[in-house]
């Protein structure tokens, strides 16, 4: 599946983007660099089972073991001490990145209830796109019986695009369903 999207990018997306933005060199064409999946776990400080469940879910979704992010400073208002687990994240590159992106746009996003497309304004000004997902059940790897609680995640797609317009064109050519 990863090869399918990568060959599509090389054979179809690159010529379209070169024509659209009048690039002189093939290396000027924007491409995907990495995808990071992040999940903040507020309840992980009190509940070790939720941390373990989240680690397993993200590992299934990403195909790679996530790393636990820990609190840098103690915050009394949130009942957090320094070094406590506060979230998990995984960074996907190369083939795993293309495989995840393919599953995200073709399988997961269409399974969202009342889905009309992703927000085209969620770019950061430098061609990178961020997307928040409210539940993990949209991925086919997660079964309804195996989850104890609905948890969302943040997906950031980092590209070599220098402007939002280039980043939007890249993701649109790759198949990202933007809302009109």
Curated annotation (Swiss-Prot):
Gene3D superfamilies: 3.30.1440.10. GO terms for biological process: translation. InterPro entries: Ribosomal_uL5 (IPR002132), Ribosomal_uL5_bac-type (IPR020930), Ribosomal_uL5_C (IPR031309), Ribosomal_uL5_CS (IPR020929), Ribosomal_uL5_dom_sf (IPR022803), Ribosomal_uL5_N (IPR031310). It holds the Pfam family Ribosomal_L5_C. Keywords: Ribonucleoprotein, Ribosomal protein, RNA-binding, rRNA-binding, tRNA-binding. GO terms for cellular component: ribonucleoprotein complex; ribosome. NCBIfam families: PRK00010.1. Part of the 50S ribosomal subunit; part of the 5S rRNA/L5/L18/L25 subcomplex. Contacts the 5S rRNA and the P site tRNA. Forms a bridge to the 30S subunit in the 70S ribosome. PANTHER family: 60S RIBOSOMAL PROTEIN L11-RELATED. This is Large ribosomal subunit protein uL5. It comes from Cyanothece sp. (strain PCC 7425 / ATCC 29141). The gene is rplE.
């Amino acid at each position: 599946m990863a090869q399918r999207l990568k060959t599509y990018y090389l054979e179809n997306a690159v010529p379209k983007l070169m024509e659209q933005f009048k690039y002189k060199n093939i290396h000027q064409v924007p491409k995907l660099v990495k995808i990071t999946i992040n999940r903040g776990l507020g309840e992980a400080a009190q509940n070790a089972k939720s941390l373990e469940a989240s680690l397993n879910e993200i590992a299934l979704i990403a195909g790679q073991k996530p790393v636990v992010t820990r609190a840098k400073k103690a915050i009394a208002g949130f009942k957090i001490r320094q070094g406590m687990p506060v979230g998990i994240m995984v960074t996907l590159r190369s083939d795993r990145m293309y495989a995840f992106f393919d599953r995200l746009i073709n399988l997961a996003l269409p399974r969202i209830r009342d889905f009309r497309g992703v927000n085209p304004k969620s770019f950061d000004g430098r061609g990178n796109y961020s997307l928040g997902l409210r539940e993990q059940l949209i991925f086919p790897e997660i079964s309804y019986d195996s989850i104890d609680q609905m948890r969302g995640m943040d997906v950031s797609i980092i590209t070599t695009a220098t402007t939002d317009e280039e980043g939007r064109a890249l993701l649109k050519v790759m198949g990202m369903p933007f809302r009109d």
